[in-house]
Design a protein with these regions (language model features):
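Short, well-ordered alpha-helix to beta-strand connector turns
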Residues: 70, 117-118
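Long amphipathic N-terminal alpha/beta scaffold segment
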Residues: 74-92
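Helix-rich interaction surfaces within compact, conserved domain-sized segments
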Residues: 21-48, 119-123, 127-196
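Acidic-basic catalytic patches of nuclease active cores, encompassing PD-(D/E)XK
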Residues: 34-79
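Short, surface-exposed linear segments at secondary-structure transitions and domain or protein termini
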Residues: 107-110, 193-198
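N-terminal amphipathic/basic-hydrophobic helices that include classical n-h-c signal peptides
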Residues: 1-18
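Conserved catalytic cores of phosphodiester-cleaving nucleases, focusing on short active-site segments
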Residues: 87-89, 94-109
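Short Lys/Arg-rich amphipathic alpha-helical segments
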Residues: 110-114, 127
Length: 198
């Protein structure tokens, strides 16, 4: 496999002159059974939610964490720092192995992300028809970018009234995510728009 050339230039965006507001912290307890990858872990994390971050976005970050979990995967600063992703996996020598975005970034953002890492993944959510028609054709040639859509109906249920201590039992089988919380079990069937889980 050839070396992937990494571009370390910052993302070209204007910086806000306003002082950052404090984030809200959440406790996340994950009991993970990933039958597809043979991963069985119980993990506890403290999650910072940016003041402008919706419950839906934070929920998708948690889904991404469970779906691509490994010991090196961690949450980035995301909304508070455009030069970091929602999540990333780094090597011991600080190379970015896997860059994970959530939401509806434009093609320029995904292209920029793909140049900083060996692999880029996106969990998209929300009203995707216009975004998909514009962005997916523009990134089809990016071989290290994989994009999946989270179904909005189940996301609405998972994200509603998110408690400060979040406890999920997650089973992943044949690419489907089954999340059990204090309200029952929820099936998250991702729709792959380009690429695959990897």
């Amino acid at each position: 496999m050839g070396l992937h050339r990494v571009d370390l230039r910052p993302f070209p965006v204007s910086r806000s002159p306003f002082m950052a507001q404090p984030s809200t912290t959440y406790k996340f307890e994950l009991n993970l059974t990933d039958l597809d990858r043979g991963v069985y872990e119980t993990v506890k994390q403290t999650i910072a939610r940016h003041p402008s971050e919706t419950e839906e976005r934070m929920t998708v970050r948690l889904l991404a964490y469970a779906f691509w979990y490994n010991e090196q995967l961690s949450f980035g600063r995301g909304l508070s720092d455009v030069d970091e992703p929602a999540l990333w996996e780094k090597s011991l020598d600080d190379r970015v192995l896997h860059w994970i975005e959530v939401g509806q970034p434009d093609a320029d953002r995904l292209t920029w992300c793909s140049r900083r890492t060996e692999r880029t993944s996106l969990l998209a959510y929300g009203s995707l028809r216009v975004w998909e028609g514009k962005v997916i054709p523009a990134i089809k040639n990016l071989k290290n970018v994989n994009v999946a859509a989270v179904p909005q109906e189940v996301l609405d249920v998972l994200a509603k009234d998110m408690p400060r201590v979040i406890k999920w039992d997650v089973m992943i089988s044949e690419g489907t995510i089954f999340v059990t919380d204090d309200r029952g079990q929820h099936e998250v069937q991702l729709q792959w728009l380009t690429g695959e889980r990897g």
